[in-house]
Design a protein with these regions (language model features):
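Well-ordered alpha-helical scaffold segments within catalytic/enzyme domains
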Residues: 1-14, 76-94, 141-155
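Short linear functional motifs in flexible/disordered or boundary regions
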Residues: 35, 89, 116, 157-158
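Aromatic (Trp/Tyr) and acidic
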Residues: 67, 134-165
Length: 176
């Protein structure tokens, strides 16, 4: 070790790309191709449409309902906006940092409008390409939304009372 330290954002991969460039490319893809500037990430790939005939759009490949407008992907999208805002602020680009913070706030509002089910007091799984609101009581999605800061205190309390069984949701096949 020679004592030289390289900033991670200046690190170059085997393709010759700096980390900063790779992050910008990934964010640009989410903002443009996946329509993130609308406040909701939308997967327009016909294979990932959130229907029973579609393919899952994420790690949870057994759940074909993830796709098109997925709560799971949108949680990560929200977190990526906050992370980009932090990076931009750290490197002194306050204009970009504020842009990402404003978009994160827009995304938080859109997330709650689209994925929060008032009648059940929890977040749904997704909205498929046919406009169907799919809810399979995904506890991990609800926990992740709370952890990410998307849920209000009241929403988090509803979620945890459902999960611990003190609040029962009619029609659920599993309780507490």
């Amino acid at each position: 070790i020679d004592g030289d330290v390289i900033d991670i954002m200046d690190h170059v991969n085997s393709s010759g790309q700096k980390m900063s460039v790779r992050l910008e490319k990934a964010m640009d893809y989410m903002l443009t191709v996946l329509e993130g500037t609308s406040g909701v990430l939308t997967i327009n790939d016909p294979e990932n449409d959130g229907t029973v005939n579609g393919k899952a759009s994420n790690y949870w490949d057994v759940h074909r309902s993830f796709g098109y407008k997925s709560s799971y992907e949108n949680i990560f999208y929200y977190q990526s906006l906050l992370a980009m805002a932090d990076l931009k602020a750290y490197y002194g680009d306050m204009e970009k940092a504020n842009y990402y913070l404003e978009l994160a706030e827009k995304t938080k509002t859109a997330f709650n409008k689209l994925f929060w089910d008032k009648s059940k007091g929890r977040y749904i799984t997704s909205v498929n390409v046919e406009g169907e609101r799919l809810d399979y009581g995904m506890t991990f999605v609800n926990f992740m939304a709370c952890q990410a800061g998307l849920a209000s205190k009241e929403q988090a309390e509803l979620i945890y009372s459902w999960v611990d069984g003190t609040r029962i949701i009619e029609g659920d096949t599993s309780q507490g």
